[in-house]
Amino acid sequence: MLKLFSAFKKNKIWDFNGGIHPPEMKSQSNGTPLRQVPLAQRFVMPLKQHIGAEGELCVSVGDHVLRGQPLTRGRGKMLPIHAPTSGTVVAIAPHSTAHPSALAELSVIIDADGEDRWIERDGWLDYRNHSREELIARIHQFGVAGLGGAGFPTGVKLQGGGDKIETLIINAAECEPYITADDRLMQDCAAQVVEGIRILAHILQPREVLIGIEDNKPQAISMLRAVLADSHDISLRVIPTKYPSGGAKQLTYILTGKQVPHGGRSSDIGVLMQNVGTAYAVKRAVIDGEPITERVVTLTGEAVSRPGNVWARLGTPVKHLLTDAGFCPSADQMVIMGGPLMGFTLPWLDVPVVKITNCLLAPSASELGEPQEEQGCIRCSSCADACPADLLPQQLYWFSKGQQHDKATAHNIADCIECGACAWVCPSNIPLVQYFRQEKAEIAAIRQEERRAAEAKARFEARQARLEREKAARLERHKKAAVQPAEKDKDAIAAALARVKEKQTQATQPIIIKAGERPDNSAIIAAREARKAQARAKQAQILQADESPSTADPRKAAVEAAIARAKARKQEQQAVTDTSANETVDPRKAAVEAAIARAKARKQQQQASANTSANETVDPRKAAVEAAIARAKARKQEQQAAANTSDNETVDPRKAAVEAAIARAKARKQQQQAAANTSDNETVEPRNTTAANGEEVVDPRKAAIAAAIARAQAKKAAQQKVVNED
């Protein structure tokens, strides 16, 4: 009795809520064996054919590749892709891929050479002798991903399961209408599928292995039972046909009675699920040493004349496959990648086949019927009754339409498997799945932005904390440096303290002077003398910096004196010109102007003499010569004036007075220059010296007296001229 109860419990299955029973339409394609399709001329291999990031390119344009050669490197969760045939890489550029929006992905474009040569294949026939890690790494590097539609990397999934997997489920339900790829694969390759299942079981070491298959596949069921006849480690469970029993959560509940928690994974309850096609790809990767370069694709629909299942190379354009199946497009023909409920319409037919492509549906207009106009929701709750995830599609519809993301998240929109059952039963023809897909995409974008903001905030806070730590450490170092002086400063500080202590000691000691003795002030006197000497030296430096160079050139001094004389002469001439311009000029004004001219000339003469006196060593002979020359010039001017007066019977007395004043000014200027030159000489030559021209040089005092006499004579001559003229 106990054994009977255990057997009953072992074969027990559960039923999930909701679900629908649409027309299956599988008989169009499941009746013919798998066939090969002729190679296309060009293959387009998108770098990303799975969930996760794309791999790193390892080929370049112009490279010749063989079938199975890696085109990218897979690291971490990145899955590599492999060349579907031998040929030449002609381009690496973005190309439209299998996506509802026909997004462009970076792709490797290969022109086939028609030889279809493989790389060297190294199969592991004795895979049981390899470790679990080695098998997982081989599966990952050979590009195996979930072929049931999700495209999750199989190696990553196996690695994440770890040792907590108790039940391995092989999904052979294939519940969506029209699709028969897994059905035909089990019929034609049942033994290889089972071998792949055993490899997965060897890696995971589960307590039980279950194959779930719907009862609408009798040929596949019979083939599997024949292969599993002598096997007791794998159980085949036949379940009722119901859509979507092939969903991961739904099939898990049907076979085990366990429900995957909201937001969780099946591995959380000890269950891991793989697809039939994935098991077949694992077998070819491990035992045959062949990377995944092709998969089974269903070509069906009334628009194709030869429906069936084919081995389609990855990267083959959809148009090439449909043409091989006898595609006869109508005016408004559509092609759906996937099934009628979960698939999407292709915008054009040059989209390549990828790892998740399981069906290409080309229906006629009669198959799909006339498009129905979307109407308002009547809240009939039919969608809620049909939902296999126990959600409220009508509420999610309102939240999605109203952009109420928080409420949609609170109502578990993430648990929606997008099976399309709600849209199938909706009497208002509302495309609920499209609303839900868009809402989930918007929520994902918001979450990604929040993650980026959180990461940026974390980086900023970490930077601020680091700066605070560095600042605190810097202040601490400064404090330690201030409290603890350096070793080289300790000696200086000690010496200073010793000097201060010595001074304090000396200040406290009394000064004792014995009777009859004088205090010893020699140190004080020496310090005073040193300060005086320092002050004198400083004053001498200041004076030396202020005065002109000690050794000036005498020629420059003479030039400056000549310039001063020229300026005085010019001013006198201007005065004479101004005086002659006026017919009636006051003699007093003329005398005043002459006096002003004499003052200016005297000032310029003094400046010139000052510049000349800067010379330390001036030859006194030259000074005497210059004085004699000045006297001669004055005498000559007086004679010229007398001659001019005698020639002119009528001479203006004013002009004569001006000329006399000019002569006196010149004589005085020359006298001052001679006196300045003579006074600057420290050592004067003997008074009676002979100049270069042979004239006798006179003492400067005598020269001054002679100049005065000359002035008196000139004045007397001028007065006499005035009297004679009157």
Curated annotation (Swiss-Prot):
Keywords: 4Fe-4S, Cell inner membrane, Cell membrane, Electron transport, Iron, Iron-sulfur, Membrane, Metal-binding, Repeat, Translocase, Transport
Major site of localization recorded for this protein: membrane
UniProt cofactor(s): [4Fe-4S] cluster
Pfam families per the UniProt record, alphabetical: Complex1_51K, Fer4_7, RnfC_N, SLBB
Superkingdom: Bacteria
InterPro entries: 4Fe4S_Fe-S-bd, 4Fe4S_Fe_S_CS, Ion_transpt_RnfC/RsxC, Nuo51_FMN-bd, Nuo51_FMN-bd_sf, RnfC_N, Soluble_ligand-bd
Residues in 4Fe-4S ferredoxin-type domain copies: 369-397, 407-436
GO CC terms, sorted: plasma membrane
SUBUNIT field: The complex is composed of six subunits: RsxA, RsxB, RsxC, RsxD, RsxE and RsxG.
Protein name stated in the entry: Ion-translocating oxidoreductase complex subunit C
Species this protein is from: Escherichia fergusonii (strain ATCC 35469 / DSM 13698 / CCUG 18766 / IAM 14443 / JCM 21226 / LMG 7866 / NBRC 102419 / NCTC 12128 / CDC 0568-73)
Lineage summary: Bacteria, Pseudomonadati, Pseudomonadota, Gammaproteobacteria, Enterobacterales
Gene transcribed to yield this protein: rsxC
